[in-house]
Design a protein with these regions (language model features):
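Residues forming the flavin
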Residues: 1-51, 56-168, 172-251, 255-466
Length: 466
């Protein structure tokens, strides 16, 4: 297989024209097979727009072709992800039945928990998932009710429930993390297998969208269950159970392996679960906590149980909306073809006085600003879009990084108190609704009294505030 880079065609071309260009690049040789690896827009000569491709193609006598071509042609090397253990084939695990107490338990069913359960189920380990929120079908109804009425369910909302916070977000699938194990492509292929559009495998900025992602998430859950896994919704982990480790060599070795997580003289023996107001013990030894960003009560519980934690920097700011067509004109030029994707941008600035960086983040083209609150009396927002990104506005976060030096104490959880402080302020100034302000008034530190040319695209109640 040969990888062809920087293959450029004008926007509006057909797939047949792309195929003909591959043949042209190969001096008339037809590929046995070919596939798109990457596709991006080149708008540097706007209004002339191009698609730039990376192609993997199989030819006869590839060695001769490679020797004749320039650096844009290389041997294609694709790393396929493989989960290292498989109970079914005996690689790395016993082929005997896993006892109940030794079954893998996963807390949370966002992206991390969902894929942990999927790979464990395929490997024959029959994982058990406990998710505090609802299945995605029921969760969607609850979230829509919240958007319309402002009545928050603290256990099932935009943050909590099957699929995690990303289910009601812009659905971005790109990462800057190096992928030497092939995990990124594995995740994308699984999404496609479960109903996502195939173009996410090669688009420079792959995106699914909330409308499609809900069905994809439900499909993955059904596969997990078909392979013997269990998923328990509306089941919250309230506490963990531990016991002191005795002096056997094996147990001391286990304690040494876990010393960066739990106190060295303790080991996990179970969980305290709550469902429908009733608490019960659940014995287990192997637990993955995939609880995401907003399960603050769980963070506090784990901290009290002496789980090792360190404070981390994060970002805070506002969402800014613009008419989507203005961003497309800015990025693509006037008279841009309709087929080009809804445009996005990136901005960054370094403040001279403080050295603090300000930058745009999580651009949401053709999407909505949504109320993403998960605690009563507090408010935060996020960007969300559907697959077609056809909303009349685009929005982005305009944020700055805060570090532990900005937090009110040196506690590992001081960052959570910092978040809560500003979420409470946002809730207060908007009377529980999303606070909205014209950007010019934001700069002047004054409340807006009427809309300008931009009508907000908001999921949830809103009102003017400063």
């Amino acid at each position: 297989m040969i990888r062809i880079s920087q293959l450029k065609l004008k926007v509006g071309h057909t797939r047949e024209q792309l195929f003909e260009e591959i043949i042209h690049q190969a001096h008339g040789k037809r590929p046995v097979s070919w596939q798109i690896v990457r596709k991006s827009v080149d708008a540097r000569k706007k209004p002339q727009l191009f698609y730039v491709y990376t192609i993997d193609a199989e030819f006869e006598n590839e060695k001769k072709l490679l020797s004749a071509k320039k650096s844009k042609w290389t041997r294609s090397t694709v790393v396929k992800y493989r989960f290292p253990y498989n109970k079914k084939d005996g690689s790395g695990a016993s082929s005997t039945e896993v006892s109940t107490i030794d079954r893998a338990v996963i807390v949370g069913m966002g992206p991390a928990g969902l894929f942990a359960a999927l790979v464990l189920a395929r490997a024959g380990f029959a994982p058990i998932v406990f998710e505090r929120g609802d299945c995605v079908e029921k969760r969607s109804e609850i979230v829509e009710h919240f958007f319309e009425r402002g009545e928050l369910d603290e256990e099932s909302n935009v943050q909590f429930g099957e699929g995690g916070a990303g289910t009601f977000s812009d659905g971005k699938l790109n990462t800057l993390v190096k992928d030497k194990f092939g995990r990124n492509h594995f995740v994308l292929k699984e999404f496609v297998k479960h109903g996502a559009p195939e173009e996410i495998l090669y688009e420079a900025k792959p995106h699914i969208g909330t409308d499609i992602l809900k069905d994809v998430v439900a499909s993955i859950r059904k596969e997990i269950e078909s392979l013997g896994g269990e998923v328990h919704f509306r089941t919250k982990v309230c506490d963990i159970l531990c016991e002191k480790i005795s002096g056997s060599v094996a147990e001391r070795e286990r304690a040494e392996a876990e010393k960066n997580l739990l106190m060295q003289d303790k080991q996990l023996t179970g969980l305290i679960l709550e469902k429908e107001g009733v608490q019960a013990e659940y014995p287990c030894r192997n637990v993955i906590f995939a609880i995401g960003h907003s399960a603050r009560d769980t963070f506090y519980m784990l901290h009290e149980r002496e789980l090792s934690m360190n404070p981390k920097a994060f970002a805070i700011g506002v969402r800014v909306e613009h008419p989507a067509h203005l961003i497309k004109e800015s990025q693509y030029g006037e008279g841009y073809p309709e087929e080009v994707p809804t445009a996005s941008y990136k901005l960054t600035h370094q403040c001279k006085g403080t050295g603090r960086g300000i930058y745009s983040f999580c651009m949401c083209p053709g999407g909505y600003v949504v109320n993403s609150s998960s605690e009563k009396g507090r408010l935060c927002v996020n960007g969300m879009s559907y697959h077609d990104r056809a909303g009349h506005n685009s929005n982005t976060a305009l944020i700055t990084t805060v570090t532990p030096d900005d937090f009110p104490s040196d506690s590992p959880l001081a960052g959570l108190e910092f978040q809560r402080k500003y979420e409470e302020l946002a809730y207060k100034i908007g009377n529980g609704k999303i606070p909205v302000q014209l950007f010019g008034d934001f700069l002047k530190n004054q409340m807006s009294t009427k809309l300008g040319k931009v009508t907000p695209s908001i999921k949830g109640e809103w009102q003017f505030a400063n």
